[in-house]
Amino acid sequence: MANSFREMLYWYRKIIDRKLPCVNVNIWRREIAYKANGICLNCLNECKVCPCDYCGIRHKCENCLNSDCFMNTNNEFNSHRWITFDEEPSQMVLFEYWIMYKDYFLSKFNYNYKAQLKILNMNKNRRFHINESKKKALSVPITSQYLKFKFNNKIYIMFGTFLTSKIQPWIQLKSLKVGYIQSLNVDRCAKLIATKGMFATNSFKSSCITEINARRPISECDYLIEACLCNENNEWKFSAVMGRDKIPVTKSLAMKYFCKNINTELFYYGHSKCHVVSECPRWNQQLRVLNASTLNIIFRRQFMNEVVEWFENFTQLTGMHYDFIKTCVYNKVIISHFRKEIEDYINSGKKISLSSVIPDGHALYTNIDILRISLMLAIDVALNRIESQQMDVL
């Protein structure tokens, strides 16, 4: 059984490129070239995976063979990093487990050690991109990313940083999915600030883009938004990346995107009862993403994810269509009144009543207080995120 630090190096082995050495059992050695055939669930890297002695699944690379299997619950690391559920866990449950994982990791990973401080120096002034097929980078593994897959009728959740964008399902694991705990920008160790280097957190990859209004195909760069911890005031700075261009996200521009995306959510909610075969603009192939730019879609998921989730849940409760109605049932009066309520709350703080969309006698009228309070809280979170964070070009 490896000791704590050696086990940490097995699990959090990070490499920048093929010319630099990788961390392996307290020593530095060069990366051996081999053909990758899967994702190692220990170092979360694209490797040549081998069968595990404990469970028989091919989920370990050659450098992680001595690490304990994720199914071995007796291991101290596994009890914090790997979580098993019988049913689909909620975001709040995942967040509680993630806090315990973060606290445990910081108690074991000491940046005062020379070997671990060397990892930070190698990461100095480098940005972490999700496109790891071209460039590999070091990153502190305390992020809001998690890996989820189903195996033997159980759901496994693993926290950590992923060094590849080519995660694919394989036969033994049934299904594999990369997710994010909300869109939180996670805490960093205080020792990072002392190095006076610029460190990037996990890049955000939106999965809701299906096409864009351009002749060129969608690339991975269209999904990125970079975040960096500023050493002067310890605040986060953001810049959206579209192609090769970095677009500054100022407070005024962020507020513009917020109002624009509120209208987008209202548009989709207003057409939620329209049948898929009707002549509704929501189902028009030319408006599949509502002519939204990549930056708008990334902004929705990065800064107002709670508002988007509220509209998604509210649509599921109220947006059932009828098969015998093949016409567009969009009601401009109701949506205009709903939009006016939201705008008044944003501008003057007037409480949202939801009386336009949930009239007296509606099936959801008994839960109207919960719905209106949750919407106002979601808007407050988005506005506080816009106001409190300094957003600029990295």
Swiss-Prot record:
Keywords: Host cytoplasm, Host cytoskeleton, Host-virus interaction, Inhibition of host innate immune response by virus, Inhibition of host IRF3 by virus, Inhibition of host IRF7 by virus, Inhibition of host RLR pathway by virus, Interferon antiviral system evasion, Metal-binding, RNA-binding, Viral immunoevasion
Top-rank taxon: Viruses
RNA-binding is among the record's keywords: yes
A GO BP annotation: symbiont-mediated suppression of host cytoplasmic pattern recognition receptor signaling pathway via inhibition of IRF3 activity
UniProt region (Zinc-binding domain), positions on chain: 40-78
Annotated InterPro entries: Rotavirus_NSP1
Region feature RNA-binding, mapped onto this chain: 2-80
Region (Important for cytoskeleton localization), start-end ranges: 81-171
GO-annotated molecular function: metal ion binding; RNA binding
Domain remarks: The integrity of the zinc-binding domain in NSP1 is important for degradation of host IRF3.
Subunit structure: Interacts (via C-terminus) with host IRF3; this interaction leads to IRF3 degradation. Interacts with host IRF7; this interaction leads to IRF7 degradation. Interacts with host CUL1 and CUL3.
HAMAP family with a match to the protein in the record: ROTA_NSP1 (MF_04088)
Protein name: Non-structural protein 1
Species assigned in the record: Rotavirus C (isolate RVC/Human/United Kingdom/Bristol/1989)
